[in-house]
């Protein structure tokens, strides 16, 4: 699975954000409201399990981590959905005014600008804190996808208000919090 690629679990489709590593083991991070749904994740609908949930945090946060159990060593890249990929070499927190791209399995790659950070978002299941808000278009199924700027990982896609005109917004969980929570790092 590449960053931004589709993942399936518990009858739902989400997206992976970034492939990460710890002690030689490979994982991907995604949205916590996705990993809350299922322990087992596949790369195709009804397909064989490629990874198993090792942690999930939602609400308050919106991140989770899945360990690859299929023996694969996936590239630490994000799918640009045009036949090419973006290498990810570091992670950082988004800043207001920053140009950002989102890769997810529904709306593919969309672009926008970071409009706010440290935002509290009230979902039906409870609030999540310290989120980033961007103008990138997104939709259901993009959840867990990658928010990035060049080779820098910025966020895990959490939710959106859709793609309507200039009012579109995509909310992300800052990825640095997930990386530190699980002791994992992005890799080339």
From Swiss-Prot:
Residues annotated as transmembrane: none
Keyword entries, A-Z: Disulfide bond, Hydrolase, Protease, Serine protease
MF-aspect GO terms: serine-type endopeptidase activity
CDD domains: alphaLP-like
Assigned EC number: 3.4.21.82
Family annotation (PROSITE patterns): TRYPSIN_HIS, TRYPSIN_SER
Enzyme class: hydrolase
Highest taxon listed in the record's lineage: Bacteria
Gene Ontology terms: biological process: proteolysis
Disulfide bonding pattern of the chain: 14-34, 137-163
Reaction(s) the record says it catalyses: Preferential cleavage: -Glu-|-Xaa- >> -Asp-|-Xaa-. Preference for Pro or Leu at P2 and Phe at P3. Cleavage of -Glu-|-Asp- and -Glu-|-Pro- bonds is slow
SUPFAM superfamilies found in the cross-reference section: Trypsin-like serine proteases
Annotated active site: 33, 62, 143
Subunit comment: Monomer.
Known function: Preferentially cleaves peptide bonds on the carboxyl-terminal side of glutamate.
Family: Belongs to the peptidase S1 family.
Entry protein name: Glutamyl endopeptidase 2
Organism in which the protein naturally occurs: Streptomyces griseus
Gene label: sprE
């Amino acid at each position: 699975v590449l960053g931004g690629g589709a993942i399936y679990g518990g009858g739902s489709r989400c997206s992976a954000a970034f492939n990460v590593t710890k002690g030689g083991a490979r994982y991907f991070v995604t949205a916590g409201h996705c990993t809350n749904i299922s322990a087992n994740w596949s790369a195709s609908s009804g397909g064989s399990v490629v990874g198993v949930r090792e942690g999930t945090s939602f609400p308050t946060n919106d991140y989770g981590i899945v360990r690859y159990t299929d023996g694969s060593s996936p590239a630490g890249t994000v799918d640009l959905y045009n036949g090419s990929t973006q290498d990810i070499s570091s992670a950082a927190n988004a800043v207001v005014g920053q140009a950002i791209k989102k890769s997810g399995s529904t709306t593919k790659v969309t672009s926008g600008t970071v409009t706010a950070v440290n935002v509290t978002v009230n979902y039906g299941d409870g609030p999540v804190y310290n989120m980033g808000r961007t103008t990138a278009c997104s939709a259901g199924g993009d959840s867990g996808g990658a928010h990035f700027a060049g080779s820098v990982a910025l966020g895990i896609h959490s939710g959106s208000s859709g793609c309507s005109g200039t009012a579109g917004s995509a909310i992300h969980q800052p990825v640095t919090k997930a990386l530190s929570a699980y002791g994992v790092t992005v890799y080339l």
